[in-house]
């Protein structure tokens, strides 16, 4: 009798745990088999991409040795590695971030204003990125970093793209599609 009671209690506990796991997984609060997405890449990596594009791509180098000696190779790695680790959707926001950084830096140089290292100030309207900057970033980053950028990035203004790069959620993959 005691053995039957223990087996019944064990079965009930296991069933409750599975039901609880399924409930929390299906509600999005937990994960069945947690597979973390790469962490959101903060602004400094996007600054590295912008600096690389401005210093290494827009400036012609005659010899590849100069390119290597200038630190461009390291900057390229620091730019491409985070891009390869984020989702395609988040890469669209990354392209916008790089384009906006370049635009702000060019405006600062043109008007003698200090460069902003972080994003726009709260409440400040986001300016539209000039087409030539966006085109240069879209033509360079995907091939240079061997990553895909969604097609809609070429036609959607940056001001309408949500900052997906800063809000990458954890995903759950469950056996049998239970989640």
Swiss-Prot record:
CDD domains: AAI_SS. It comes from the Eukaryota. It holds the Pfam family Gliadin. Contains 7 disulfide bonds. Keywords: Disulfide bond, Seed storage protein, Signal, Storage protein. GO terms for molecular function: nutrient reservoir activity. SMART domains: AAI. The keyword Disulfide bond applies. Residues 1-19 form the signal peptide. Seed storage protein. Not integrated in the gluten polymer through disulfide bonds, unless incorporated by reduction and reoxidation during dough making. Increases dough strength and bread volume, but decreases dough stability when added into a base wheat flour. Belongs to the prolamin family. This is Avenin-like a2. It comes from Triticum aestivum.
